[in-house]
């Protein structure tokens, strides 16, 4: 049994792939019904072959920055009718955009030039690697005749060895290919793309600048779709894992389920919800899994994030006598400085290909999606934890009413953001206090949600917003970005305007790096204030559609949101003036615990 990439059948299967919360047009795996346009034999060049392969796997947009080593390749990408080249202001944002696009569409791609472009995009590719996103990073390389000649080229560090870029990418991609001849090019390209999809990680593909326009018989006129053999469980291991887990859970009094971020890569969102339905357990999500499973399910109890969890969620999870974590990542951020009150002997850890029950046994070659589906058939129904939650739950209060023209509070801002959400919207949360405020948003069915928790690179959200909005055109995306993060990557607001996107950006201007203030304060956390609306107006420059507003009180915010919701075909930028000390209580708690973890003294030698 094999999975057919690029077929109508594959697209139909993808609609039920378990990627709950993803747009219908942007399934969690990169199968689409897009068919590359046929070309004549004379046009069957390397560049067109790559372009058609990208279209086959679901890439409609490539985020690029031109440079002399990739110009010919870009010509061939542009020539493919099913592919659009999105020119970005810098390579970092192009990489972030490919990251956001992969979140929306299942796979993304960016194109840069040799070394100066490659090393610039490297940070974004590292982030995509940490978040398990298949991004195809294409770099234009030197002329194939220059390899091994002892020549020194521009855009290098002045050595005749051209491998510096390749070696940098080896640590942040799952596969690397340097294409310097036509004979093997088709295999190198196909292997790189297939590996990205199979591993759900970025790949690096360097193509010599003199090759894209050259034809070769292997670049067939009507390319036959390649196949990805699906990963299957070892049946004996699967049965043993299910049996051990059923025994573990069925003897528990108040078991719970917790969804983690690797539900995405395992395409197990639907299987997880099916297990909730079958078991009756209360379920929560880890913060980086928000948006991967529905929050409208009656047994959903919120975000489990240790000391900064949703109210009453941590009490239920940590008091359970058995907890199944599906696809967790336990790092210092998600564990609030390693302060989780969890016991390993009570935990079942289900990773995409492995199950660990308590302190053992462990079962390898067990696919999460299959495991959860089989478990749902055999686990006993037990609603005790959910009933306990209902007994202690007290509805969350509302922010204090604002006085007329009172300076705007951040909790009032997010009260209004909550009202904006529906099934046609999505939320992008930047690293910082927006992490914590956006976690408290209650997502309607079908509302998307993305943030970058594992890598946590400030500025990610601007490029990711560009890419996500380009990949999910059925969504109106709402981005919450701090001023410090915005200063890193602000330029590509111009690309959003060029692409006629209609996202709504809330720029929270509180004068500094708030999240870092709460971890460790110092004068370096204060930034130069910008006229952010003036900056965006200057970027707009009368070309395209863009509307800006600066708000300082709730009355102005209400009016601005009303205008933004009315401007449905326009990029809307709302600068929110906030007090520098106006932070969520969760950030205050989280920051102190992460600070304590960071400042641990060295272990005695």
Curated annotation (Swiss-Prot):
It comes from the Eukaryota. Signal peptide: none annotated. Its cofactor is a metal cation; thiamine diphosphate. Residues 433-515 are annotated as: Thiamine pyrophosphate binding. GO terms for biological process: aromatic amino acid family catabolic process to alcohol via Ehrlich pathway. Substrate binds at residues 68, 155, 516. Keywords: Decarboxylase, Lyase, Magnesium, Metal-binding, Thiamine pyrophosphate. Mg(2+) binds at residues 483, 510, 512. Gene3D superfamilies: 3.40.50.970, TPP-binding domain. Pfam families: TPP_enzyme_C, TPP_enzyme_M, TPP_enzyme_N. Binds 1 metal ion per subunit. Binds 1 thiamine pyrophosphate per subunit. One of its GO terms (cellular component) is cytosol. GO terms for molecular function: magnesium ion binding; pyruvate decarboxylase activity; thiamine pyrophosphate binding. Transmembrane segments: none annotated. Its EC number is 4.1.1.1. It catalyses: a 2-oxocarboxylate + H(+) = an aldehyde + CO2. Homotetramer. Belongs to the TPP enzyme family. This is Pyruvate decarboxylase 2. The gene is PDC2.
